[in-house]
Design a protein with these regions (language model features):
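...the same signal can extend to comparable exposed beta-sheet modules
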Residues: 1-175
């Protein structure tokens, strides 16, 4: 289930890699299948300037070139919620993330909290290899499974996009 959604300039450049050619750095005409922030899927050629070692299941920042190919940027490693870097797509390798629908914040195991932007996009892996995409404001409160968490912050330190894994789909934010 994917909810179509309005995406803004700050959130449209994020996608989950659904499928990517193995060893794409050395492949001829390598391609990638992305689940974009608006919930649509797209297959595109991989630009040679893309970061290396990108695998399925990662959240990437991307730009589409004039020829239709995509240049993808990997997340940078952060050791904890306190170490998340502004204006960067971060990855926490072993995190539990909670979303609070009332405060519109993500909380990390080290008691760090980060506010989400009004247009924040949540990518949720609710079953292995199955994703939902939704505005974070539309979700009910939830806690992720412990594991990789991708958190992208804007220059002000607010969350613009994130990817976490959960046991099942989070509820919607019915008040």
């Amino acid at each position: 289930w994917v909810a179509a959604q309005q995406v803004t300039e700050s959130t449209k450049d994020y996608a989950v890699v659904e499928k990517i050619d193995a060893n794409y750095e050395n492949a001829v005409n390598p391609s990638v299948k992305l689940i974009k922030a608006d919930g649509t899927k797209a297959t595109a050629a991989i630009d040679s300037d893309s970061d290396t070692n990108i695998v399925a299941g990662e959240l990437v920042k991307y730009k589409t070139n004039n020829d239709g190919s995509v240049e993808m940027t990997k997340a940078k490693t952060a050791n904890s919620g306190k170490n998340l870097v502004n204006d960067t797509l971060n990855i926490l390798s072993n995190a539990t993330v909670s979303y609070n629908k009332n405060t519109k914040q993500l909380a990390f195991g080290d008691n760090t909290k980060k506010a989400t932007t009004s247009d924040c996009v949540a990518f949720i892996e609710y079953e292995t290899g199955k994703y939902m995409v939704a505005p974070s404001d539309s979700l009910g409160s939830f806690t992720s499974k412990t594991g990789k968490a991708y958190i992208s912050l804007d220059k002000d330190g607010k969350v613009v996009a994130f990817l976490v894994s959960t046991d099942g789909k989070p509820s919607n934010n019915a008040s």
